[in-house]
Structure formats: C-alpha cells, structure tokens
Amino acid sequence: MASVQRKSWCALTIRLLGRTEIRRLAKELEFRPRKSLGQNFVHDANTVRRVVSTSGVSRSDHVLEVGPGLGPLTLALLDRGAHVTAVEIDPVLAERLPHTVAEHSHSEIQRLTVLNRDVLTLRRDELAEPPTAVVANLPYNVAVPALLHLLAEFPSIRTVTVMVQAEVAERLAAEPGGKEYGVPSVKVRFFGRVRRCGMVSPTVFWPIPRVYSGLVRIDRYPTSPWPTDPAFRRQVFELVDIAFGQRRKTCRNAFVDWAGSGNESADRLLAASIDPARRGETLSIDDFVRLLQRSADRGGTDREGTSPPTAGQGAPAR
C-alpha cells in the first residue's frame, strides 16, 4: 500500500495542503470535523495527485467537486486548468475555500465557484455551465445517493472519479452473483461502466477513519444502450429494488406482485430470456432492462397505466 502512495502520478505547480496546514486551518476556523457529515480530509499530496491523474481532467473540463472541505483536491483540480464548482454543505468550509485558493494561487480563483449546498438537492439550473466530470472525496454517508443523483441530474457528466469507503467501492464494482453485488452495483451501471482503481490507506486522511477507502471511476456510456428518460429509469430501478428486496427468492416469486401472478411473472421472465428459477442477485442491468421492455411488448403496464418505453422510445436524457 505504501509503495502505491509514493508513486508519482502527475506534476502539480500549486503548493498543496499538507497535514500541518490542514490542522492549522481547522484551528484557525475553530473547526472540528463532524462524523455525521463524513468529514475526513485527505492531506497526502501523492494521493491527491493519484486521484487527479485517474480522473484525466484537463482545461476543457468543468469539474463538479462534492465535499471539498478545506480544499486539498480543489487546488489540484484547478492546477490542471479545469473550471471547478465545489459543492460544500458546511457553511464555514464553504466560506473559507475561496480564500484558501487565493492564498495558494490567486490566478486560479477565477475558475472556482463555491456553492454552500447539499449535493442531494443540487439541480442543473443552478450551474452556469454543465459539468463534464465529477471528482471528489465523497462523504461515506452519502456516497451512493450522491452518485446516482448526479448521474441522473447531469447527463453532461462523462466521467466520475471518487474516493469512497472500500466496502462501497467493492459494491459499486461488483459483478452479478457475487456477495457484494447489490442495488448500487446495478443502478450505477444504468449510466455507465465502473472500475476500481485501487485502495487508499486511512493514514492519508485527517481525522484518520477506521476503514480503508477505494478509488472508483465511472465512465458514462458514449451512447446509452437503453432509454434514459426519468420514467424509464424509475421503472427499471423499481425492478432492481424488488429483486434485491427479496434477493434469495427465485425471480418468479420475487416478481409475483409486480407481474400480477406467478404464471405471468414466469412468462415475462421467459420472454426476456431469463430463467424464472434464477435469483435476483444474478441479474445484470441488461437483464432488468430487457425484462421491462419485454413486459411492455407483452402489454404489461406500469402503476400509472402506461406501457414502459421500448428501446429508442425514451425522452431526452435527464
């Protein structure tokens, strides 16, 4: 692990925040990290370089950073020439961030926007320009909801590079049938491909968390294989929730209420080339999408009484 952290990832010209300076800033602000907000700040320059290098952001990118905290990752992103919109829920940290950037490189401040907001309520009309990338050290307690919200709300986002709790990283990248495979694994693949990019030691954070972190990158599909409108996505996600709410049941039994009867459930599954005896935890995102679309072909309806769209009939992406 240590050898990974020492690797040189990319050259930065801005002086980054180290552990001593982060502690000094916290003391200056009379600030104590709150566990309820998942506030753990990365202070290791090599880790910051690694995250930025993995993201691949450049001058052409508008980066959405979630939970910038005291600004170590923000500085590195600005150093790459990107425009950065930093979304920080803590008002004290949000107010201090522009001053920190100005102190380290005054010329970069023009490319920084800070929003004192909860990322889960962020809407696209609040940003002057659509973001092309997300790069963040995500608070553990909101990692999955934040990822799904941002991918749905901002279709302009092409890549997501985040540090999350190692367990969350494993779940996001898990394959069908594995013990870590679950709702997050499937839903994030509705939007794009997921890959793990290594582990991150707890010692690079202040305060030191009790668990390892994982670095994850998500690349949105260049062209979505299925409709991306909110109604279609909601129906697919409903099937995912049903399947994993009863993950040890066979698919036939898990989808009885949704289909209306056991026989209809089996027929819809067979129409989608899914063995009714399979368990929900073995289904891929392709399986869930196909199940919904084949149900529509058979005349199945959603709870509002309208047939789910088949491929190519989706509304503009949200």
From Swiss-Prot:
InterPro entries from the UniProt entry: KsgA/Erm, rRNA_Ade_diMease-like_C, rRNA_Ade_Mease_Trfase_CS, rRNA_Ade_methylase_Trfase_N, rRNA_adenine_dimethylase, SAM-dependent_MTases_sf
Coarse class of the protein's main subcellular location: cytoplasm
Region (Disordered), start-end ranges: 295-318
Record localization: Cytoplasm
Bias (Basic and acidic residues) ranges: 295-305
Catalytic activity: adenosine(1518)/adenosine(1519) in 16S rRNA + 4 S-adenosyl-L-methionine = N(6)-dimethyladenosine(1518)/N(6)-dimethyladenosine(1519) in 16S rRNA + 4 S-adenosyl-L-homocysteine + 4 H(+)
Any one Gene Ontology cellular component term annotated for this protein: cytosol
Binding site for S-adenosyl-L-methionine: 40, 42, 67, 88, 118, 137
One MF annotation (Gene Ontology) recorded for this entry: 16S rRNA (adenine(1518)-N(6)/adenine(1519)-N(6))-dimethyltransferase activity
The protein's Enzyme Commission number: 2.1.1.182
Pfam short name (any one): RrnaAD
Keywords: Cytoplasm, Methyltransferase, RNA-binding, rRNA processing, S-adenosyl-L-methionine, Transferase
Top-level taxon: Bacteria
Functional description taken from the UniProt entry: Specifically dimethylates two adjacent adenosines (A1518 and A1519) in the loop of a conserved hairpin near the 3'-end of 16S rRNA in the 30S particle. May play a critical role in biogenesis of 30S subunits.
PANTHER family (alphabetical): DIMETHYLADENOSINE TRANSFERASE, DIMETHYLADENOSINE TRANSFERASE-RELATED
Record family assignment: Belongs to the class I-like SAM-binding methyltransferase superfamily. rRNA adenine N(6)-methyltransferase family. RsmA subfamily.
Identification of the protein by name: Ribosomal RNA small subunit methyltransferase A
Organismal lineage: Bacteria, Bacillati, Actinomycetota, Actinomycetes, Mycobacteriales
